[in-house]
């Protein structure tokens, strides 16, 4: 298989179009990731993950209402493109296996990978003319579900189920809200969401994160601490599930890295090596492809490889 993320037309200009490559290797699976895809009026425009997040609709929904659209916090556009590309490659490899060994091209556009996870954004607009807007830390149309301050951090509380809401209100000392007829369902709670958020926030602000989690846990109300990197690195649950692994880099440094997701029962996988420097694995890859030491040395002497 071949993976490339040049601007569309670059490989064609090098004489390496899919048609030319498939003549040499009909079974080739080729993943092409670009800003706007291999076709369409925007195909020749340059694009990065951030631009894909903007065009895909994500940036418009991220941040506080009426404020500047903000970044999610990680390079989610690039990650989503990679995940969609992986799904496409696995599908194409399976197709090749069961349908005579023929390869194909997977075309992933950054903005489409983002758009594909935007839930009901377009159906809402198509059916009702609703343009969804940024909602800050809250979950739009669901109440109460938000981040609330504590003395030493923040917690996320999802008290939006009808019975959960009543238990939440009892826990924070507001049974009057839990018993209010107009708050018995989500629609009524959404109408009074600011009042509910204020009540929960006033209660949580007088307690530590752990006190809040203990109280809500006893009441079977879904809640969780807003973790920092330090919190994750020291968390026993992460360690118990092998999500914090020690890895020695090729420079000799020992660092913690994320474990493997998803977890397969029969073939859980492992991290075999750290990330290479540029060219570290060239000889091994070429040898695996059948080149001799002499052929590899010749390529290096001609400057084809380093």
Question: For each predicted feature, which ranges?
Answer:
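Rossmann-like NAD(P)-binding element
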Residues: 1-12
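Residue-level detector of anion-binding/catalytic polar loops
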Residues: 1-2, 27, 222
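Residue-level signal for nonpolar/aromatic packing positions in well-ordered secondary structure
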Residues: 3, 21, 30, 49, ...
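Active-site-adjacent "lid/gating" segments in soluble enzymes
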Residues: 12-155, 159-160
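Aromatic-enriched alpha-helical interface/lid elements that frame and gate functional surfaces
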Residues: 143-219, 223
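Flexible, small-/acidic-enriched active-site or ligand-binding loops
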Residues: 184, 252-298
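A glycine-rich dinucleotide-binding beta-alpha-beta segment and adjacent secondary-structure elements
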Residues: 218-272
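Amphipathic terminal alpha-helices
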Residues: 234, 294-306
């Amino acid at each position: 298989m071949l993976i490339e993320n040049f601007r569309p037309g670059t490989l064609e200009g090098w004489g390496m179009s899919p048609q030319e490559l498939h003549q040499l290797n009909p079974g080739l699976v080729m993943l092409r990731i670009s800003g706007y895809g291999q076709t369409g009026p925007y195909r020749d425009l340059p694009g990065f993950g951030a631009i894909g997040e903007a065009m895909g609709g994500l940036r418009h929904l991220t941040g506080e209402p009426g404020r500047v659209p903000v970044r999610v916090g990680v390079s989610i556009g690039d990650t989503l493109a990679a995940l969609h590309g992986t799904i496409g490659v696995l599908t194409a490899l399976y197709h090749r296996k069961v349908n005579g060994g023929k390869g194909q091209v997977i075309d992933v556009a950054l903005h489409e990978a983002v758009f594909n996870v935007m839930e009901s954004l377009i159906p809402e607009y198509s059916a009702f003319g609703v343009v969804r807007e940024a909602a800050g830390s809250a979950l739009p149309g669901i109440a109460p579900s938000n981040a609330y301050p504590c003395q030493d951090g923040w917690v996320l509380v999802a008290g939006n189920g009808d019975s959960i809401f009543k238990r939440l209100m009892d826990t924070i000392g507001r049974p009057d809200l839990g018993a209010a007829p107009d708050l018995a369902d989500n629609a009524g709670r959404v109408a009074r969401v600011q009042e509910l958020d204020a009540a929960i926030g006033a209660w949580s602000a007088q307690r530590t994160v752990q006190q809040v989690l203990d109280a809500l846990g006893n009441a079977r109300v879904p809640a969780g601490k807003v973790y920092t990197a330090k919190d994750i690195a020291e968390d026993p649950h992460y360690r118990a599930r092998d999500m914090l692994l020690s890895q020695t880099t090729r420079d000799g440094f020992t660092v913690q890295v994320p474990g493997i997701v998803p977890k397969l029962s029969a073939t859980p996988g492992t991290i075999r090596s750290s990330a290479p420097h540029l060219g570290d694995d060239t000889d091994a890859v070429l040898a695996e492809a059948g080149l001799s030491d002499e052929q590899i040395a010749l390529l290096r002497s001609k400057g084809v490889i380093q």
